[in-house]
Swiss-Prot record:
Name of protein: Glucagon
Similarity comment text for this entry: Belongs to the glucagon family.
Subcellular location: Secreted
PROSITE patterns: GLUCAGON
Any one cellular-component term (Gene Ontology): extracellular space
UniProt KW keywords: Hormone, Secreted
Main localization category: secreted
Length: 29
């Protein structure tokens, strides 16, 4: 199902973004 693939890809993308934001936050602290 293409919807499920999109959802999992999207959550992976969000996880990556959150991880990068978290690293940036750590660097700035």
């Amino acid at each position: 199902h293409s919807e499920g693939t999109f959802t999992s890809d999207y959550s992976k993308y969000l996880d990556n973004r959150r991880a990068k934001d978290f690293v940036q936050w750590l660097m700035n602290t």
